[in-house]
């Protein structure tokens, strides 16, 4: 049979060679005969600590990209009635993900952070939002916050890596050989560093574990790059798959710093069949501009009370061109372009408005007055019987310093009219 190899056009220049390997596994009488075991022993002897813990204080820049897409779409999905007059959006679908399933990006978010931390006399850290950019919808903060909460930083040298509050054995942990088979498959050069390529896979396919490869420096036995993919047997509610790729900058033989991390999470409430529709979360985090022992002011450690929708975080396009640590791919640029086109379609505007109403529970009546909560219009209880309620509130923005709300309600069983009025003011 013919073998087709697909390459993403934006990444081809980064590829020095392509290695195609089968599933043949070399058998060893014992692990000491396995050359990968000797290499992993050196890794364990020289286990690294995150370099941030080795300084009195530290600061660094983080550039983060988050994308959400409808995954595993097909022609039948594209022909659904809801997409009439919106067919052009499928021109933006692509398969730029690990499993190469066709996905339609629907949300994109960029954030730049500046993190300040101190280790002495006690551990303190503050992550300040410098700039934030949404893909164009009216209210993205809830979507972005939900997406960001799905991702957690992991230390590859830990024995256990936590995802969704579930522990997965780390392939670089000291007890890795209890869970994984290791195989030395190749040697490569990564940014001028000669590295071993060690492939790993779980001994037991039924357990929660990863498969992938580790790139390990031949000189210092640092992990230069790690790729982790959950097995097909992953048994976590609503989670179809996890893929993680981490790159590290090693300052010396004892410490490392995170350099780049890329994560994909595929989630679905519709089941785990191969053709099931799912939501694909993708996150890229790039860390740079590390500085240490600068003795910065304690003010940098004070909580700023920021939200992603703060007006002062909105920056012009030329700011983003200068400050992006990594340029946007064609797919990422197209999310902004697609949303711009969608916002010109009346049907889409109505869909967005409906989603906003369902999300907030309020209907904008005029100017800054909302009616709601719509979920409280009707109720039933022992005292009032059937109950109807009408309410309203002021709403200028998600960050209102003050807000007034009121309601009136009537119970048909007790035949009593109720009402209430409240005012809120945020002092800080």
Question: What does each model-identified segment do?
Answer:
Residues 24-195, 201-209, 270-379:
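Structured extracytoplasmic
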Residues 4, 40, 245, 389-391, ...:
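Membrane-embedded beta-strand positions in outer-membrane beta-barrel channels/transporters
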Residues 200, 227-232, 369-380, 390-391, ...:
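Transmembrane beta-strand segments that form the barrel wall of outer-membrane beta-barrel proteins
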Residues 212-214, 218, 243-253:
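Extended lipid/amphipathic-ligand handling interfaces
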Residues 1-32, 243, 263-269, 275-276:
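Periplasmic N-terminal soluble interaction domains immediately after the signal peptide in Gram-negative
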